[in-house]
Amino acid sequence: SDGRNEAANDEASDVIELALKGCCSNPVCHLEHPNACGRRR
C-alpha cells in the first residue's frame, strides 16, 4: 500500500462532507439523510 488510495478516500470524504453540509441546510435533503445531518434540533 503506497498511501495513494487513502489520500483519495480522504479527499472524497471531504467532498461528501461539504455536500452533506449543504444538504443539511436543505429541508428536503435533510429529511432524506437525517443520519448524515446529526438530527440537531
UniProtKB/Swiss-Prot annotation:
Disulfide cross-links: C23-C29, C24-C37
KW Secreted (keyword) present: yes
Compartments it resides in: Secreted
Region Ser-Xaa-Pro motif, crucial for potent interaction with nAChR: start-end pairs: 25-27
GO cellular component: extracellular region; host cell postsynaptic membrane
Propiece residue ranges: 1-21
Family: Belongs to the conotoxin A superfamily.
Entry note about domains: The cysteine framework is I (CC-C-C). Alpha4/7 pattern.
Its biological purpose: Alpha-conotoxins act on postsynaptic membranes, they bind to the nicotinic acetylcholine receptors (nAChR) and thus inhibit them. This toxin blocks rat neuronal nAChR alpha-3-beta-2/CHRNA3-CHRNB2 (IC(50)=128.9 nM) and alpha-7/CHRNA7 (IC(50)=1511 nM). In vivo, intramuscular injection into zebrafish does not produce any effect on the locomotion of zebrafish.
Protein name (Swiss-Prot/TrEMBL): Alpha-conotoxin CIB
Organism in which the protein naturally occurs: Conus catus
